[in-house]
């Protein structure tokens, strides 16, 4: 969102919020009343039809939707790795005994650095790995700011570069906001995935449910769905959730924008929370895990190009004056280990910037042996 302006000054667009909006509780209540009346008069079939034909306006940054076979393959990979990933994450928590506050100890600077959050045994990268990573980062720096964090959940060791570089995150934040909805609202029974949002801020979401909107926002990076979710749920605990995770709400997440500016360190903290949530093995957490594994765009997945790895991510990309970004972050499960990777750059999105972020992801991924 452009700085110096309020949310209400903008018409719907990437990075802005709809001009006016109703209260969340009122919107949900109205939606439930409509659904109840329809069910009472036997028009369930009509509701299903409406659901099926509801128009979807995809994000300006949307890529082509992956075909059904791709999604099916990713969901199968999630199912097959479910037990292993859950066990790995549980073991990692016991082994490292880290809190998200420990991520404050990650080094930050304009050179590639390694770190350990559990002991003083700082890992050393091989010269070839370091050179490949530095080269990819230098390419990104030619087009904008760049920062990255790559972290082994099991060992507590990682690699970092400009961990505090604040970058417009674009749609990379959509998955993290959905984490808030699922973890804080759905799991506690305050919100049902099957609730219809109805009308928010004068924008009619039709009969789309919370489930529909989350899937569209995460898998297809649909902006309208994400903005509708924020309009509905920002005021029912979002700020408390952020602060509770040790995130500086005022500086790390811009309260005036649906698409915040933040840094790789903050991203890593939030994806650590994501890893803990996905390991719970609840119906909602495993559903979200499948969505993250089925995203239509992943520079990380493209970069590491490892069929044995499960990548659960959310990328963000845009080329627009004042809010350029090519970013990606998520979890990588491979060989019984789980890694957090966050790459944030202010490069204007293009085929070239996509390739550069993919190259950074590949170079980071290739350092994992040194982090064991």
Q: Language-model segments: what does each one mean?
A:
Residues 160, 214, 225-279:
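Mid-domain, small-residue-enriched loop/turn segments at the edges of structured enzyme/sensor domains
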Residues 163-168, 202-206, 253-262:
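A glycine-rich, coil/turn loop motif that links secondary-structure elements
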Residues 212-221:
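Short helix- or helix-capping micro-motifs
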Residues 260-319:
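A conserved catalytic-loop motif detector
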Residues 2-140, 158, 166, 278-296, ...:
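Structured C-terminal helix/loop/strand segments within mature extracytoplasmic catalytic/sensor domains
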Residues 156, 166-197, 217, 341:
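Active-site SXXK
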Residues 148-154:
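Short hydrophobic alpha-helical segments used for membrane anchoring or interfacial signaling
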Residues 183-209, 281-285:
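Short, well-structured active-site flanking segments
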């Amino acid at each position: 969102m452009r700085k110096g302006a309020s949310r209400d000054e903008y018409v719907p667009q990437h990075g802005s919020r709809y001009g006016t909006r109703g209260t969340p509780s009122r919107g949900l209540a109205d939606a439930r009343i409509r659904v109840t009346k329809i069910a009472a008069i036997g028009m369930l079939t009509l509701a299903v039809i409406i659901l099926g034909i509801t128009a979807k306006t995809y994000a300006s940054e949307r890529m082509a939707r992956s075909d059904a076979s791709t999604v099916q393959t990713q969901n199968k990979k999630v199912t097959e790795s479910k037990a292993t990933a859950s066990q790995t994450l549980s073991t990692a928590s016991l082994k490292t005994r880290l809190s998200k506050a420990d991520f404050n100890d990650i080094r930050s600077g304009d050179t590639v650095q390694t770190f350990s959050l559990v002991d003083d045994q700082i890992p050393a990268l091989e010269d070839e790995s370091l050179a490949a990573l530095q080269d990819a980062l230098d390419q990104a720096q030619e087009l904008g700011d760049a920062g990255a964090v790559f972290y082994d959940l099991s060992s507590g060791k990682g690699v970092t570069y400009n961990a505090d570089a604040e970058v417009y995150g674009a749609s990379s934040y959509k998955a993290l906001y959905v984490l808030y909805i699922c973890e804080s609202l759905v799991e506690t029974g305050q919100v049902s995935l099957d609730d219809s949002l109805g009308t928010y801020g004068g924008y009619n979401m039709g009969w789309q449910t919370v489930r529909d909107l989350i899937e569209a926002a995460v898998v297809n990076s649909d902006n309208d769905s994400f903005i509708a979710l924020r309009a509905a749920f920002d005021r029912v605990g979002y700020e408390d959730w952020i602060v509770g995770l040790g995130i500086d709400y005022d500086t790390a997440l811009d309260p005036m924008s649906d698409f915040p500016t933040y840094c790789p360190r903050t991203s890593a903290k939030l994806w650590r929370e994501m890893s803990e949530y996905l390991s719970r093995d609840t119906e909602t957490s495993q559903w979200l895990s499948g969505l993250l594994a089925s995203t239509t765009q992943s520079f990380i997945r493209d970069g590491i190009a490892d069929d044995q790895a499960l990548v659960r991510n959310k990328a963000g990309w845009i080329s627009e004056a004042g809010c350029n970004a090519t970013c990606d972050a998520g979890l990588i499960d491979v060989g019984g280990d789980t890694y957090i990777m966050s790459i944030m750059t202010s490069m204007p999105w293009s085929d070239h910037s996509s390739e550069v972020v993919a190259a950074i992801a590949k170079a980071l991924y290739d350092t994992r042996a040194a982090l064991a």
